[in-house]
Amino acid sequence: MSDKTVKVQLVKSLIGTRETHRATVRGLGLRRLNSVSELQDTPAVRGMINKVSYLVKVIS
C-alpha cells in the first residue's frame, strides 16, 4: 500500500444531497461540517473524493 495520505474536509452541508453521496461522505469518515479526515491516498479514495467534490475540499 502507499504511505501517502490525503486530508479531506467537509465544507458543504449534506442537506438535500443524494443518499449515495451522503453514504460516500460517511465512507470518507466525515460527519459534521468542517470535519477533517486523513485517509490513505489510493485510487478508491480518490474516486470517492471525485464523486463528492462539490461537498469536500482536499487540504493536503
From Swiss-Prot:
Protein name, entry field: Large ribosomal subunit protein uL30
A GO molecular-function descriptor: structural constituent of ribosome
One record GO biological process: translation
NCBIfam families, per the entry: rpmD_bact
Originating species: Paraburkholderia xenovorans (strain LB400)
Pfam families: Ribosomal_L30
Superkingdom as given in the UniProt entry: Bacteria
Similarity comment text for this entry: Belongs to the universal ribosomal protein uL30 family.
Assembly mode: Part of the 50S ribosomal subunit.
